[in-house]
């Protein structure tokens, strides 16, 4: 039977519940425990697919095509298991399911209420999401005290009552603010947060106290006394410069031992040697690489969370420190490409809407004409095709029908039909709903023999995750190829364009993909496409007049992906 660890948060949002949950899962996994994670989001949206990145941050896409919370990306990066649509659900999904049941008459004419119907549905979703895991770590989104979180908190309270005592554990993450004028950490917000949680009927077994400095012993004792939590279970969640240090930080304070004791789990000792090697590689780079990430959501970098982490992973596996410069594409439209001077590589990520598109195209033109390594992802590939069509293939005014429906050269057009991972035919039109109607999830791609893409992946067939409505218009591929652009990967079956590249006689490293490789990058394994991108940037930096990217005069020997972390 599955045992449950429930993770809640108090005082303020964005304290890092997802990182804490993922770190605990990583430690338990090294102890031989089969673990999974769930994220419960209290908002009424069915999923975050149509939410603004400025409000929600990144939308993480799972292998089975679910648009989910960005915390699922952290989960996949910290443990070996893959998340599915069952690992993330929202208030919207719960109410939608209950209302459908009511319409079918499943409640036999009874009055449908939050308790028991909504809470029962939440418990059902938790059990289904846990699957056959030994331990399911369940993160409750939001903050204790939020009205929308109450049904979720009531549901997990009921589970603690209904299950044996040793089958549940509650972890509460709070903030210990430091008041400069007083010169001390303040515990009162934590006391009140736990008080509010206890009023709901939940007594935390562990407190994770987020702070920017050490927690004095007397303050720890004070927190334990006033929250009814054992002193050894009051654990400091110290601010660190890398999230990949958190597993060791929590393990050193015996969090995993406390949880295993509460859940009555017998497990081998934790082995965090891989995580320690990873952190060592992160802290001992041999070069610095400057990457320009040109996007429209740069004011909230959480919008590109998986992407920034994938670049960090590539840095780990190439012994490079990655400095990411977030560049607003609209600023390029206004002020030109001067902000890209000194960059070792340029990356244009995915995005939606017309705003900032021409600035991204200008950045791509700058990368191509100056032979700077370029990686385009999703929209970044589509705009690379548009730039090449305009400036090399003689199609002046070429555009995407997403932004310019009347363009004379619609080199990017709506994907009308394709087959899902399960082989089901999917058909879309311009009038289709926005939510959940894109080409989503893992899709098989065939790599062209002799292409740079095939050399990078070392395979003729890959599966990568997608999230898009528009695609390269096959009608214009012959003209693009005649001008010099190569279609280096296509989808299995439909022959949709999946990757483009330029011959290395024209450009040393110019690669773009319709899919999102960042969703499958992990710190332990990295990702071949990002590693190759960073290696290309390192070569460019070495050839630059100043070579300012070098940490030492002795250039390290290049190595293959994954050589440093076993």
UniProtKB/Swiss-Prot annotation:
A GO BP entry: 'de novo' CTP biosynthetic process
Source superkingdom: Bacteria
Binding residues annotated for ATP, in chain numbering: 14-19, 71
Description of how activity is regulated: Allosterically activated by GTP, when glutamine is the substrate; GTP has no effect on the reaction when ammonia is the substrate. The allosteric effector GTP functions by stabilizing the protein conformation that binds the tetrahedral intermediate(s) formed during glutamine hydrolysis. Inhibited by the product CTP, via allosteric rather than competitive inhibition.
E.C. no: 6.3.4.2
Keyword Metal-binding part of the UniProt annotation: yes
Residues bound to L-glutamine: 351, 379-382, 402, 469
Keywords: ATP-binding, Glutamine amidotransferase, Ligase, Magnesium, Metal-binding, Nucleotide-binding, Pyrimidine biosynthesis
Region spans: Disordered: 545-566
The keyword NAD is annotated on this UniProt entry: no
Molecular function, one GO term: glutaminase activity
Domain Glutamine amidotransferase type-1: 290-543
Pathway: Pyrimidine metabolism; CTP biosynthesis via de novo pathway; CTP from UDP: step 2/2
Binding, Mg(2+): 71, 139
Cellular component annotations (GO), alphabetically ordered: cytosol
Described purpose of this protein according to its UniProt entry: Catalyzes the ATP-dependent amination of UTP to CTP with either L-glutamine or ammonia as the source of nitrogen. Regulates intracellular CTP levels through interactions with the four ribonucleotide triphosphates.
Family in the record: Belongs to the CTP synthase family.
NCBIfam families recorded: PRK05380.1 (NF003792), PyrG (TIGR00337)
Subunit description: Homotetramer.
Stated name of the protein: CTP synthase
Organism expressing this protein natively: Nitrosospira multiformis (strain ATCC 25196 / NCIMB 11849 / C 71)
């Amino acid at each position: 039977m599955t045992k449950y660890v429930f993770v809640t948060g108090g005082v303020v949002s964005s304290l890092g519940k997802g990182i804490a949950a993922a770190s605990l899962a990583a430690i338990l996994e090294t102890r031989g425990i089969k673990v999974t994670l769930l994220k419960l989001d209290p908002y009424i949206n069915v999923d975050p697919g149509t939410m603004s990145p400025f409000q929600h941050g990144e939308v993480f896409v799972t292998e089975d095509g679910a648009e989910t919370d960005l915390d699922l990306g952290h989960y996949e990066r910290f443990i070996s298991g893959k998340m599915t649509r069952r690992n993330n659900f929202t208030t919207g999904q719960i109410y939608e399911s209950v209302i459908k049941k009511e319409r079918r008459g499943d409640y036999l004419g009874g009055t449908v209420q939050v308790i028991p119907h909504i809470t029962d549905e939440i418990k059902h979703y938790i059990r289904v999401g846990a699957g056959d895991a030994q331990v399911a770590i369940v993160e409750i989104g939001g903050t204790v005290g939020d009205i929308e979180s109450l049904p979720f908190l009531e549901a997990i309270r009921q589970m603690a009552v209904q299950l044996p005592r040793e089958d549940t554990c509650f972890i509460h993450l709070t903030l210990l603010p430091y008041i400069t004028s007083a010169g001390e950490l303040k515990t009162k917000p934590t006391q009140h947060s736990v008080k509010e949680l206890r009023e709901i009927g939940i007594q935390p077994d562990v407190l994770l106290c987020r702070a920017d400095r050490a927690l004095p012993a007397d303050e720890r004792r004070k927190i334990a006394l006033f929250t009814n939590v054992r002193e050894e279970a009051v654990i400091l969640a110290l601010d660190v410069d890398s999230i990949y240090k958190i597993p060791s930080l929590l393990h050193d304070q015996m969090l995993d031992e406390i949880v295993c004791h509460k859940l009555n789990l017998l497990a081998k000792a934790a082995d965090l040697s891989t995580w320690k090697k990873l952190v060592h590689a992160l802290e001992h780079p041999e070069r610095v690489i400057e990457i320009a990430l040109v996007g429209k959501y740069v004011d909230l970098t959480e919008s590109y969370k998986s992407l920034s982490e994938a670049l960090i992973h590539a840095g780990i596996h190439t012994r490079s420190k990655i400095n990411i410069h977030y560049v607003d594409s609209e600023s390029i439209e206004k002020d030109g490409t001067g902000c890209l001077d000194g960059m070792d590589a340029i990356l244009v990520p995915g995005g939606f809407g017309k705003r900032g598109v021409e600035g991204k195209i200008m950045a791509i033109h700058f990368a191509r004409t100056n032979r700077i390594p370029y990686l385009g992802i999703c929209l970044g590939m589509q705009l690379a095709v548009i730039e090449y069509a305009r400036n090399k293939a003689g199609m002046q005014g070429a555009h995407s029908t997403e932004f310019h429906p009347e363009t004379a050269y619609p080199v990017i057009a709506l994907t009308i039909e394709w087959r899902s991972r399960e082989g089901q035919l999917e058909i879309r039109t311009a009038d289709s709903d926005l939510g959940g109607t894109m080409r989503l999830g893992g899709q098989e791609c065939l790599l062209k023999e002799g292409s740079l893409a095939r050399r990078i992946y070392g395979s003729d067939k890959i599966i990568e995750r997608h999230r898009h409505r528009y695609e390269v218009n096959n009608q214009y591929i012959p003209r693009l190829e005649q001008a010099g652009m190569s279609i280096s990967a296509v989808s299995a079956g439909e022959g949709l364009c999946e990757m483009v590249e330029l011959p290395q006689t024209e450009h040393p490293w110019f690669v773009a993909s319709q899919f999102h490789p960042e969703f499958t990058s992990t710190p332990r394994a990295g990702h071949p496409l990002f590693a190759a991108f960073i290696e290309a940037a390192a070569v460019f930096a070495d050839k630059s007049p100043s070579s300012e990217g070098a940490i030492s005069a002795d250039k390290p020997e290049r190595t293959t992906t994954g050589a440093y972390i076993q």
